[in-house]
């Protein structure tokens, strides 16, 4: 499940400003 989700996120997230910062806060 997470494998498929991560593939989608890896394609979409780089195009969304502030995503990296958000992920760093979550982790």
UniProtKB/Swiss-Prot annotation:
The keyword Secreted applies. It comes from the Eukaryota. Keywords: Antibiotic, Antimicrobial, Cytolysis, Hemolysis, Secreted. Expressed by the venom gland. One of its GO terms (cellular component) is extracellular region. It is found in: Secreted. Coiled coil: none annotated. GO terms for biological process: defense response to bacterium; killing of cells of another organism. Its main location: secreted. Antimicrobial peptide forming an alpha-helix in watery and membraneous environments, enabling it to perforate membranes. Active against Gram-negative bacteria E.coli DH5alpha (MIC=5 uM), E.coli MH1 (MIC=0.6 uM) and P.aeruginosa PAO1 (MIC=10 uM) and against Gram-positive bacteria B.subtilis VKM B-501 (MIC=0.6 uM) and A.globiformis VKM Ac-1112 (MIC=0.2 uM). Has cytolytic and hemolytic activity. Belongs to the ponericin-Q family. This is M-ectatotoxin-Eb2a. It comes from Ectatomma brunneum. The lineage of its organism: Eukaryota, Metazoa, Ecdysozoa, Arthropoda, Hexapoda.
